[in-house]
């Protein structure tokens, strides 16, 4: 190979007859340089002329030859990026010459010849990467900060990325093959910011835990607290130092007896000396019992407003929480707060949520509710006592409460808040009419008589619905029509005014409802007819309203004749259909009537002793509630023969009622036609208009 002395990068040196020529790299070079000794070592390992090099007399002589230069600065050559750095190859210029006469030439290799077996692309598989390392094709690697990815630089200066698995031998493999190893410092390698970032998360975590526990010690239990983990055991009761319920006994109507009992409790709190001077003890608890909507919670609010002492209020369901033991902890916390404010009142609404009978044995394991009620029993009348704290509680299920909770010393008094009578309903209607524009034609007495069995909540809803109807009709005041329509809406649902009813169906419904009304009007000792309507409401195509006796409702006592009349009235609709339209054209409209008749007849036989064959014996006792420690289902305490007798007696009572109804309708068929025609024309007939059909006096009460 010829060289030119004018090229400063081509140097020659003669040593014992051998000539070493260092040729310049190809024009594609970079500015970064490496020592020639490093280049010689790397290229010597991969030289294809290794055998020829071994033919030299001595490797030491060759090393001396390579490092003998008068100008060390000239032994630095540029490291190319593409193609790779030059290598040292030893070639024999003439095989016939002696060893000392051989020429050793260092030339730049052909890049394609050495890198042709490297993988393509910038993303290598791990197996391809290991294969290239073992072949010496990888010059250096740089690991990511977490060690999951590395970036390699091949001998041809190509770069690729490899996803690194968890291989503990990788570092040893790289070191054995002379690969330069480094680790990325990450972006923005500022040590101060890295240090702060590493500390930030632990500081935030500890700060959050500290804040939560501080909130648990003085959080939701106090005013404005956010609560915390420790707050689970704290009571959720609302505390009022000076109760501002806005309710007094003057706002409570229709519960005079209950007010009298509770006014005495208020007097205990205001003037305790008057009672203690006579040796009387202040009652520790007062249980308000009554149906839903009778005003139990309203009475408790009135007590708070009248007493003027600190008032705690909570719902029993708030005691039981997700975690075991929280209920008992909250009971303790509630009474600790109450004792610190004594004398005071603690009101627990719907106490049956935690006060149910114990020992049902249904769930297995420990019942959280039992822990809560045990703690409540201890706080109300336990070893330490709770002097100065009066507990008010309300429930509509007194039958499910534990007997230990109802004994004297805990709930000393049970105040029954029952449905109001006529006088009470009049007072309640007046209370709920405050702030409403009531017309002069409204008679509270008549409205009260049309609403037997209504509670205070029902009457409040009635007046509210009447006000809504008046506003919908763009009226300036509430008249009796709005109250009447609101009453029917509450009882039977809204009118279906847009329902398309054929004339045939309207005629059928008119005769059906006329049959009910006619039989009811001519039955002795039965409720008077209040209104008849064939306007569809809810699931009913027509309705007949009767005004039940106030005395009968309050006493709950029904005679045998009344129950027999009730069955006959219920069958009057089906009888009218049969008489007018024939047996083949009767409809399913009497299905609810049959259910009512069957229920009344079976109760007369099984419970009320109105059957001669069964006698004064109750058969088929009601099943107990298994969650109250009672039997899972009712036991059949009678034989199959007795069951057959019961069925026969029920059927006989129903048949007798059917005969009575049919006799009335066939006898007074003219009045039936008049009433049905009036209903077809007007769709609604009130009780007075209906009774005017009997002015001629020809119709007489049915006598069996």
Curated annotation (Swiss-Prot):
Disruption phenotype: Leaf-variegated. Mutations can be complemented by overexpression of FTSH1. The presence of both FTSH1 or FTSH5 (subunit type A) and FTSH2 or FTSH8 (subunit type B) is essential for an active complex formation.
Cofactor: Zn(2+)
Tissue-by-tissue expression: Ubiquitous.
Conditions for induction: By high light.
GO cellular component: chloroplast; chloroplast envelope; chloroplast thylakoid; chloroplast thylakoid membrane; plastid; thylakoid
Membrane association type: Single-pass membrane protein
Primary site of residence: plastid
InterPro entries reported in the protein's UniProt record: AAA+_ATPase, AAA_lid_3, ATPase_AAA_core, ATPase_AAA_CS, FtsH, P-loop_NTPase, Peptidase_M41, Peptidase_M41-like
EC assignment: 3.4.24.-
Gene Ontology biological process terms from the UniProt entry: photoinhibition; photosystem I assembly; protein catabolic process; proteolysis; PSII associated light-harvesting complex II catabolic process
Transmembrane segments: 193-213
Alphabetical UniProt keywords: ATP-binding, Chloroplast, Developmental protein, Hydrolase, Membrane, Metal-binding, Metalloprotease, Nucleotide-binding, Plastid, Protease, Thylakoid, Transit peptide, Transmembrane, Transmembrane helix, Zinc
Binding positions (ATP): 290-297
GO molecular function: ATP binding; ATP hydrolysis activity; ATP-dependent peptidase activity; metal ion binding; metalloendopeptidase activity; mRNA binding
Intracellular or extracellular location(s): Plastid, Chloroplast thylakoid membrane
Active site feature: 513
Cofactor note: Binds 1 zinc ion per subunit.
List of residues binding Zn(2+): 512, 516, 593
Segment annotated as transit peptide: 1-58, 59-76
Pfam families named in the record: AAA, AAA_lid_3, Peptidase_M41
Subunit structure: Heterohexamers with FTSH1, FTSH2 and FTSH8.
Function, as annotated: Part of a complex that function as an ATP-dependent zinc metallopeptidase. Involved in the thylakoid formation and in the removal of damaged D1 in the photosystem II, preventing cell death under high-intensity light conditions. Not involved in the degradation of the light-harvesting complex of photosystem II (LHC II) or in thermotolerance.
Membership in a protein family: In the N-terminal section; belongs to the AAA ATPase family.
Protein's recorded name: ATP-dependent zinc metalloprotease FTSH 5, chloroplastic
Annotated organism of origin: Arabidopsis thaliana
Name of the coding gene: FTSH5
């Amino acid at each position: 190979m010829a060289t030119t002395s004018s090229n400063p990068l081509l140097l020659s040196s003669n040593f014992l007859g051998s000539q070493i020529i260092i040729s310049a790299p190809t024009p594609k070079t970079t500015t970064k340089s490496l020592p020639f000794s490093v280049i010689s070592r790397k290229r010597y390992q991969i030289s294809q002329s290794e055998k020829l090099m071994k033919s030299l007399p001595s490797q030491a002589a060759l090393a001396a030859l390579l490092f003998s230069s008068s100008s060390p600065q000239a032994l630095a050559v540029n490291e190319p990026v593409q193609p790779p750095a030059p290598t040292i190859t030893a070639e024999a210029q003439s095989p016939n010459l002696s060893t000392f006469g051989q020429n050793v030439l260092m030339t730049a290799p052909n890049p394609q010849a050495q890198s042709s077996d490297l993988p393509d692309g910038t993303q290598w598989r791990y197996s391809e990467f290991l294969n290239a390392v073992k072949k010496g094709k990888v010059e250096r690697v740089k690991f990511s900060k977490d060690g999951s990815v590395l970036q390699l630089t091949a001998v041809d200066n190509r770069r690729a990325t490899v996803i690194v698995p968890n291989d503990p031998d990788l570092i040893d493999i790289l070191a054995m093959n002379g690969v330069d190893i480094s680790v990325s410092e990450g972006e923005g390698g500022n040590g101060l910011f890295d240090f702060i970032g590493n500390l930030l998360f632990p500081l935030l975590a500890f700060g959050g835990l500290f804040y939560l526990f501080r909130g648990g010690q003085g959080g939701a239990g106090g005013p404005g607290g956010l609560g915390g983990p420790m707050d689970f055991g704290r009571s959720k009761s609302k505390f009022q130092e000076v109760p501002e319920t806005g309710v007094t006994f003057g706002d409570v109507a229709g519960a005079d007896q209950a007010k009298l009992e509770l006014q005495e409790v208020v007097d205990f709190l205001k003037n305790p000396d008057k009672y203690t001077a006579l040796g009387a003890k202040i009652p520790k608890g007062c249980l308000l019992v009554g149906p839903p909507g009778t005003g139990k919670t309203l009475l408790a609010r009135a007590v708070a407003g009248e007493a003027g002492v600190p008032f705690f209020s909570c719902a029993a369901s708030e005691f039981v929480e997700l975690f075991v033991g929280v209920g008992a902890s909250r009971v303790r916390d509630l009474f600790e707060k109450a004792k610190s404010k004594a004398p005071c009142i603690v009101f627990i609404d719907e106490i049956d949520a935690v006060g149910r009978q114990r020992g049902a044995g249904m769930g297995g394991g420990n019942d959280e509710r039992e822990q809560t009620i045990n703690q409540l029993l201890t706080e109300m009348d336990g070893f330490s006592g709770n002097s100065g704290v009066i507990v008010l509680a309300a429930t509509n299920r007194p039958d499910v409460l534990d007997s230990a909770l109802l004994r004297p010393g805990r709930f000393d008094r049970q105040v029954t808040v029952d449905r109001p009578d006529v006088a009470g309903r009049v007072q309640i209607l007046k209370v709920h009419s405050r702030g409403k524009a009531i017309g002069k034609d409204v008679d509270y007495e008549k409205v009260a008589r049309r609403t037997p069995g209504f509670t205070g909540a029902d009457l409040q809803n009635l007046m509210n619905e009447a006000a809504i109807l008046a506003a919908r009709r763009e009226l300036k005041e509430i008249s009796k029509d709005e109250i009447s329509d609101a009453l029917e809406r509450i009882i039977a649902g809204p009118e279906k005014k847009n329902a398309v009813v054929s004339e045939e169906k309207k005629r059928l419904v008119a005769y059906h409802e006329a049959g009910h009304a006619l039989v009811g009007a001519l039955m002795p000792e039965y409720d008077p007819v209040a209104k008849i309507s064939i306007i569809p409401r809810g699931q009913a195509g027509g309705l007949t309203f009767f005004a039940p006796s106030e005395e009968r409702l309050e006493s709950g006592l029904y005679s045998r004749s009344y129950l027999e009349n009730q069955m006959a009235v219920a069958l009057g609709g089906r009888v009218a259909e049969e008489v007018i339209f024939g047996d083949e054209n009767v409809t399913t409209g009497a299905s609810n009537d049959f259910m009512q008749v069957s229920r009344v007849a079976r109760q007369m036989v099984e419970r009320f002793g109105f059957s001669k064959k069964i006698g004064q014996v109750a058969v088929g006792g009601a099943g107990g509630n298994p969650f109250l420690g009672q039997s899972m289902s009712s036991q059949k305490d009678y034989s199959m023969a007795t069951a057959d007798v019961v069925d026969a007696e029920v059927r006989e009572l129903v048949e007798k009622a059917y005969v009575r109804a049919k006799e009335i309708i066939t006898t007074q068929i003219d009045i039936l036609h008049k009433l049905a025609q009036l209903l077809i024309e007007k769709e609604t007939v009130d009780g007075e208009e209906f009774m005017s059909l009997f002015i001629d006096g020809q119709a007489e009460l049915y006598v069996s």
